[in-house]
From Swiss-Prot:
Protein name: Hydroxylysine kinase
Catalytic activity: (5R)-5-hydroxy-L-lysine + GTP = (5R)-5-phosphooxy-L-lysine + GDP + H(+)
GO cellular component annotations of the record: mitochondrial matrix
Entry function: Catalyzes the GTP-dependent phosphorylation of 5-hydroxy-L-lysine.
Subcellular location: Cytoplasm
Highest taxon of the lineage: Eukaryota
Entry coiled-coil feature ranges: none
GO biological process terms held by the UniProt record: lysine catabolic process
Organism: Homo sapiens
Alphabetical keyword list: Cytoplasm, Kinase, Transferase
Pfam family, one: APH
Length: 373
């Protein structure tokens, strides 16, 4: 498929439901009386914050998720995601509750006549989780440690998850799976010809030479794959000393889940925690310490971490530039990572792998002695 045709098909896939249509969907599919809806930002799906009329014992706030046409063609994957959300909630993780349709399913396929064709979209309803995205707050080393720990616990817990359609998480050409970094090559035109593109091309080259050859040595698991600073919610409480303490109150967006490796999860988490940090290079050590308190990395995994973090920066930055060409009206949301991401990636390259690793690994080691840096 040519890039032109590919762009067009991708552009058509994002849902464009109005607030009135979203409200009608909730009432017809889930049987709830809607009092108000408001759109929420989303990368390539459509989300709405839904308020319903007070019921005797049910929640009054939900998130309506409308999958794009491409994702809607894979109902098995959506079903597995829903069951993972329910499984993690039962295991004590702060995930949403999945609402059942009037037909007692966890999702429903709705068809819409767009005039030129009929499009089908999978719709789901999840309970709305309280809290603020950590992107809105300065994150302490202790919270970074807890987020690293959470990422490892999540992956480890999912080793116990079973489902007859689990194979749907083997997403071979999924652009957001970290092992598919070489697939970025067909989107590089979105960057133009500049220094940023040169860095990305260099990262892809190193990835092919130094990561692809080591994949068989990494330990496999199911990855959340998108523990970014907008998908982790936190709430504050007062400590005994009167200071504010923050706890994770919500984990959002399981749409990028796939089979991967433990080291992928920690690399992705480190990269996203760097985005808003005033000391981005320091972040990795605290996240790594938390992760390794549950799942210590092997020497081979540790050796790949620097390049994997760089690779995730490249995935996010390239796909944001590409998506901005498709959805210019969504530019503010799509370019959140780019505001600081290019600068952080450049800094990592300027410092070099050895210097960055030294900071990360020394910081992580300091937790073992009880004196965190």
């Amino acid at each position: 498929m040519s890039s032109g045709n590919y762009q067009q098909s991708e552009a058509l896939s994002k849902p464009t439901f109005s607030e009135e249509q979203a409200s009608a969907l909730v009432e017809s599919v889930f049987g709830l009386k809607v009092s108000k809806v408001r759109p929420l930002p989303s990368y390539d799906d459509q989300n709405f914050h839904v308020y319903v009329s007070k019921t005797k014992d049910g929640p009054t706030e939900y998130v309506l998720k409308i999958s794009n046409t491409k994702a809607s063609k894979n109902p098995d994957l959506i079903e597995v995601q829903n069951h993972i959300i329910m499984f993690l909630k039962a295991a004590g993780f702060p995930t949403a509750s999945v609402c059942h349709t009037k037909g007692d399913n966890t999702a429903s396929l709705v068809s819409v006549d767009s005039g030129s064709e009929i499009k089908s979209y999978l719709v789901r309803l999840l309970t709305y989780l309280p809290g603020r995205p950590i992107a809105e707050l300065p994150v302490s080393p202790q919270l970074l440690y807890e987020i690293g720990k959470l990422a490892a616990k999540l992956d480890k817990t999912l080793q116990r998850f079973h489902h007859p359609k689990l194979s749907s998480l083997h997403r071979e050409n999924f652009i957001w799976n970290l092992k598919n970094v070489p697939l970025l090559e067909k989107y590089l035109y979105a960057l133009g010809q500049n220094r940023n593109r040169e860095i990305v091309e260099h990262v892809i080259h190193l990835f092919k030479e130094e990561v692809m050859t080591k994949l068989s040595h990494f330990r496999e698991c199911i990855n959340h794959g998108d523990l970014n600073d907008h998908n982790i919610l936190i709430e504050s409480s007062k400590s005994a000393s009167g200071n504010a303490e923050y706890q994770v109150s919500g984990i959002l967006d399981f749409g990028d889940m796939s089979y991967g490796y433990y080291v992928f999860e920690v690399a992705i988490t480190i990269m996203y925690m760097m985005i808003e940090s005033k000391s981005p290079i320091q972040v990795g050590g605290h996240v790594l310490a938390g992760f390794e308190s549950i799942t210590p990395l092997t020497a081979v995994e540790k050796g790949a971490l620097f390049l994997l973090v760089c690779s995730r920066f490249c995935q996010s930055l390239v796909m944001a530039a590409y998506s901005c060409q498709l959805y210019p009206e969504n530019k503010d949301y799509l370019m959140v990572t780019a505001k600081t991401g290019w600068k952080h990636l450049q800094q990592m390259f300027d410092m070099g792998q050895k210097a960055v690793e030294e900071i990360w690994f020394e910081t992580a080691k300091s937790y073992e002695s009880g004196i965190s840096m």
